[in-house]
Amino acid sequence: MPSFTQPHSAPRNFQFPGQQRQGDPTMGTINAELADKGFLVTSTDELITWARTGSLMWMTFGLACCAIEMMQMSMPRYDIERFGVAPRASPRQSDLMIVAGTLCNKMAPALRKVYDQMPEPRYVISMGSCANGGGYYHYSYSVVRGCDRVVPVDIYVPGCPPTAEALLYGILLLQRKIRRNGSIER
């Protein structure tokens, strides 16, 4: 029987649900007795959190040139779906929004409306200098100086425009943050 406690192909920082409690002597005994029978003992919250990190559904909110790099991330060279992140077109089916580009004052209510349509728990990645703080157009009268003034942002990806690798790293950081917090609600 394969052992579920020691995965052979998992990355170094990967943890199956329940591994956070391996130091507990009671859980260690139960896990040891059931591991050779093909069972995994965990809590519901740990299982949901583990599943959530591997099934992020993202939607684009591309406003400028950063959106090109965001599209490149889902192409075969980087293949973001191998990390458990798949694109969705509807905000009602996605739990991650990537804001890429310059957010102007007229577009801010639309961003908030789309964010409010997303189901909980929902996450936001701010991609690029313009989305992070206004960027090149920071002093313009019509530009919002960062999308965090409209929606709460979880991860900031710097650059003008940031590379697809930087966005991919930001998504991996978000997965690590979800795994570390381990909460269903924000």
Curated annotation (Swiss-Prot):
<keyword id="KW-0472">Membrane</keyword>
<feature type="binding site">
    <location>
        <position position="130"/>
    </location>
    <ligand>
        <name>[4Fe-4S] cluster</name>
    </ligand>
</feature>
<dbReference type="GO" id="GO:0009060">
    <property type="term" value="P:aerobic respiration"/>
</dbReference>
<dbReference type="GO" id="GO:0048038">
    <property type="term" value="F:quinone binding"/>
</dbReference>
<keyword id="KW-0004">4Fe-4S</keyword>
<feature type="binding site">
    <location>
        <position position="65"/>
    </location>
    <ligand>
        <name>[4Fe-4S] cluster</name>
    </ligand>
</feature>
<keyword id="KW-0874">Quinone</keyword>
<protein>
    <recommendedName>
        <fullName>NADH-quinone oxidoreductase subunit B 2</fullName>
        <ecNumber>7.1.1.-</ecNumber>
    </recommendedName>
</protein>
<comment type="function">
    <text>NDH-1 shuttles electrons from NADH, via FMN and iron-sulfur (Fe-S) centers, to quinones in the respiratory chain. The immediate electron acceptor for the enzyme in this species is believed to be ubiquinone. Couples the redox reaction to proton translocation (for every two electrons transferred, four hydrogen ions are translocated across the cytoplasmic membrane), and thus conserves the redox energy in a proton gradient.</text>
</comment>
<keyword id="KW-1003">Cell membrane</keyword>
<dbReference type="GO" id="GO:0005506">
    <property type="term" value="F:iron ion binding"/>
</dbReference>
<keyword id="KW-0479">Metal-binding</keyword>
<dbReference type="GO" id="GO:0045271">
    <property type="term" value="C:respiratory chain complex I"/>
</dbReference>
<keyword id="KW-0408">Iron</keyword>
<keyword id="KW-0813">Transport</keyword>
<dbReference type="GO" id="GO:0005886">
    <property type="term" value="C:plasma membrane"/>
</dbReference>
<comment type="subunit">
    <text>NDH-1 is composed of 14 different subunits. Subunits NuoB, C, D, E, F, and G constitute the peripheral sector of the complex.</text>
</comment>
<feature type="binding site">
    <location>
        <position position="160"/>
    </location>
    <ligand>
        <name>[4Fe-4S] cluster</name>
    </ligand>
</feature>
<dbReference type="GO" id="GO:0015990">
    <property type="term" value="P:electron transport coupled proton transport"/>
</dbReference>
<keyword id="KW-0997">Cell inner membrane</keyword>
<dbReference type="Pfam" id="PF01058">
    <property type="entry name" value="Oxidored_q6"/>
</dbReference>
<keyword id="KW-0830">Ubiquinone</keyword>
<dbReference type="InterPro" id="IPR006138">
    <property type="entry name" value="NADH_UQ_OxRdtase_20Kd_su"/>
</dbReference>
<feature type="region of interest" description="Disordered">
    <location>
        <begin position="1"/>
        <end position="27"/>
    </location>
</feature>
<keyword id="KW-0520">NAD</keyword>
<dbReference type="GO" id="GO:0008137">
    <property type="term" value="F:NADH dehydrogenase (ubiquinone) activity"/>
</dbReference>
<dbReference type="GO" id="GO:0050136">
    <property type="term" value="F:NADH:ubiquinone reductase (non-electrogenic) activity"/>
</dbReference>
<comment type="similarity">
    <text>Belongs to the complex I 20 kDa subunit family.</text>
</comment>
<keyword id="KW-1278">Translocase</keyword>
<feature type="binding site">
    <location>
        <position position="66"/>
    </location>
    <ligand>
        <name>[4Fe-4S] cluster</name>
    </ligand>
</feature>
<dbReference type="InterPro" id="IPR006137">
    <property type="entry name" value="NADH_UbQ_OxRdtase-like_20kDa"/>
</dbReference>
<dbReference type="GO" id="GO:0051539">
    <property type="term" value="F:4 iron, 4 sulfur cluster binding"/>
</dbReference>
<keyword id="KW-0411">Iron-sulfur</keyword>
